[in-house]
Amino acid sequence: MSRVALLKGGRSLERQISLRSGAQVQDSLERLGHEVTAIDVGPDLVDRLEAARADVAFVALHGRGGEDGTVQELLDVLGLPYTGSGPAACIRCMDKVIAKHALRDAGIPTPDFYAFSEAAFNDLGAARALPAIEARLEFPIVVKPAAGGSALGIKFAASAADVPGALVAAFSYDTKVILERHVAGRDLAVSVLGPAGTPRALPVVEAIPRDEDFYDFEARYEIGRTTFRCPAELGEEVTARAHELALGAYRELGCYGFARVDLMLEAATGELYVLEVNAIPGLTETSLLPQAADAAGIDFDALVAEILELALARETSTAAG
């Protein structure tokens, strides 16, 4: 058994979700017989890691500071193996602009988009280009922060009158925003496990919000707000295509260990589009990765054990090389 430093909480806007993920993971690690030191991440992180004398870190952080490569870079400096993707992959996944450009360049379909920084609006007059953007994307348009997760700051603009308010909301979460073509259809997710070279896709999950068309923060994390179907009721070809795109995105962004790929199945065309890749997906009681694993015959403890084993295997492989 290992001494595990469980990193949770932190100071991001997704702190509460991280605490919930961390609580679930801690219970599992203890059931598996590991010695767990739970660390609510803050300015004393390095001191607490050194005091813990851990063999491995289980990163259950979400949002800035934990999912954007910062903690991963620090753990690399300290020589402590950790779960999930490395700094570069985390940076690519966290910044949706970088991720979408990489996916598009690799031929992986993602909704058309334009991205601008706050400085572009303040210093370059980007607001004057909004009519041209709106004409190309057509309404409704999705406006969202470039970084972040859990659907925080995402707004739908049904008309030009809605765009300024949506931009203000998105800029309250980040200094860079994305304006994206809205894909109306079914909200799907494919979780992926394994090293970049030989990952495997888990059954597709479909999220069906009960009260709203949009799978927002409340729908994601409040029990009873969303119906989940896993495996999703899709034809074999669509399922295979969803798996193909998810694995392609996972490899293209350099993910390792585990990740979740969010997709939309467009109702009008039957086409699949990759929305984003989450380098550290939630592990709460309503999260999609545990549901997908369960549908594949992997209970939560086995899922946590595999994620931990992959972290140690990467360290062993690196040391051997």
PLM region spans:
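Hydrophobic beta-strand scaffold residues
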Residues: 36, 81-82, 110, 141, ...
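Active-site nucleotide/adenylate-binding loops and adjacent lid/helix of ATP-dependent enzymes
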Residues: 1-8, 51, 92-186
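A short glycine-rich, hydrophobically flanked beta-strand micro-motif that places a catalytic Asp/Glu
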Residues: 37-42, 181, 188, 256-268
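ATP-dependent carboxylate activation and anion-phosphoryl transfer catalytic cores
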Residues: 2, 235-321
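Short beta-strand-to-turn element immediately C-terminal to the catalytic PLP-Schiff-base lysine
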Residues: 116, 154-159, 192-195, 266, ...
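Phosphate-binding site of ATP-dependent enzymes
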Residues: 158-244, 272-273
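ATP-binding N-terminal substructure of ATP-dependent carboxylate-amine bond-forming enzymes
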Residues: 1-101, 105, 117-131, 306, ...
